């Protein structure tokens, strides 16, 4: 897969990043290099290799599952632009 100039500009627009005409070429090269590396990773045979979550072996830290006092609803919605009865108010998005 190859990224062209139009795709670079579209990605920049979607990411809300201002990209000058001088920056499009280098970005195109970087994106193509990243995609080539990802394609190369797809060819690696990983049959029989166990999945890993970390490069160093470690156990997940667990805490005791206890019921705690809530009562923080007012703190949770404190920075929301609009609330009602400790619920977030959002614009209607489906008719």
Swiss-Prot record:
E.C. designation(s): 6.3.5.-
Gene3D superfamilies, A to Z: Glu-tRNAGln amidotransferase C subunit, N-terminal domain (1.10.20.60)
Any one GO molecular function term: asparaginyl-tRNA synthase (glutamine-hydrolyzing) activity
SUPFAM superfamilies reported in the protein's UniProt record: Glu-tRNAGln amidotransferase C subunit
Keyword field contains Oxidoreductase: no
Biological process according to GO: glutaminyl-tRNAGln biosynthesis via transamidation; regulation of translational fidelity; translation
Enzyme class: ligase
One Pfam family matching this protein: GatC
Reactions listed under catalytic activity: L-glutamyl-tRNA(Gln) + L-glutamine + ATP + H2O = L-glutaminyl-tRNA(Gln) + L-glutamate + ADP + phosphate + H(+); L-aspartyl-tRNA(Asn) + L-glutamine + ATP + H2O = L-asparaginyl-tRNA(Asn) + L-glutamate + ADP + phosphate + 2 H(+)
Assigned keywords, A-Z: ATP-binding, Ligase, Nucleotide-binding, Protein biosynthesis
Keyword Signal: no
Function: Allows the formation of correctly charged Asn-tRNA(Asn) or Gln-tRNA(Gln) through the transamidation of misacylated Asp-tRNA(Asn) or Glu-tRNA(Gln) in organisms which lack either or both of asparaginyl-tRNA or glutaminyl-tRNA synthetases. The reaction takes place in the presence of glutamine and ATP through an activated phospho-Asp-tRNA(Asn) or phospho-Glu-tRNA(Gln).
Oligomer and partners: Heterotrimer of A, B and C subunits.
The family this protein is said to belong to: Belongs to the GatC family.
Protein name: Aspartyl/glutamyl-tRNA(Asn/Gln) amidotransferase subunit C
